[in-house]
Amino acid sequence: MKKYNVCIVGGGSTYTLGFLKSFARMQEEFPLNKLVLFDIDGERQKPIGQYGDIMFSERYPELDFSYTTDPAEAYQDMDFIFMQMREHIPLAHGKIGQETCGAGGMAYGLRSCVDMIEAIHQIRQYSPEAWILNYSNPAAIVAEALRREFPDDKKILNICDQPENVVRSTSRLLGYDWEDLDPVYFGLNHYGWFTHIYDKNTGELMWGMI
């Protein structure tokens, strides 16, 4: 099986720890040759990188793991690039800091879109065929900006698991198996509605979930 080269942009995020553990756990299903963390804030990224050094030396010693603040080093010859950028504006002004809707979402989107577009232009210089998995919020706004800027790039995937998480938690509270549900979701990723929820087995509308 091919071993992949992967870069995580925003390596200083605490969410990166979950990715590192997942890569170590799934090395048989998704084997890696190289894993690089990239962040513009080297000090913030350093403890995450040190954690990776220790964990991979014990659980994945053959992995080529590193962390850097140099985009040329981070983006070179990658197969997959995970994007996780976060900007902070509203909280500094005493406003709601929700990152996908309202004033926070709009401000976040205006900043994230610019940085995302710049990052992807850089990535394509070094890894033109890499799959880019973006989960920077506000996901819907960033996805639309990337679609307009890179209309022919079919290897940019925009991901959010919030709707699925809502279905999982709600079904558990109400005593249903979420895998038996067929939901219809409308709206932004953190600001939407389930207009219908059907039973996959019968096709009937599940009034108990509404």
Residue positions per predicted region:
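Rossmann-like NAD(P)-binding element
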Residues: 38-44, 62-129, 134
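Substrate/ligand-engaging "lid" and interaction regions
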Residues: 152-155, 159-210
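A structural signal for short, well-ordered beta-strand segments and their strand-loop junctions
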Residues: 82-83, 132-136, 157-159, 185
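Gly/Ser/Thr-rich loops at beta-strand to alpha-helix junctions
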Residues: 12-15, 42-43, 131-142, 162-164
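NAD(P)-binding Rossmann-fold cofactor-contacting core
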Residues: 30-53
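Short, surface-exposed basic-aromatic patches at helix termini and helix-loop junctions that form
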Residues: 25-28, 53-58, 125, 144-156, ...
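N-terminal Rossmann-like dinucleotide-binding module
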Residues: 5-35
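Conserved N-terminal glycine/acidic-rich loop preference
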Residues: 2-4, 9-12, 44-45, 142-157
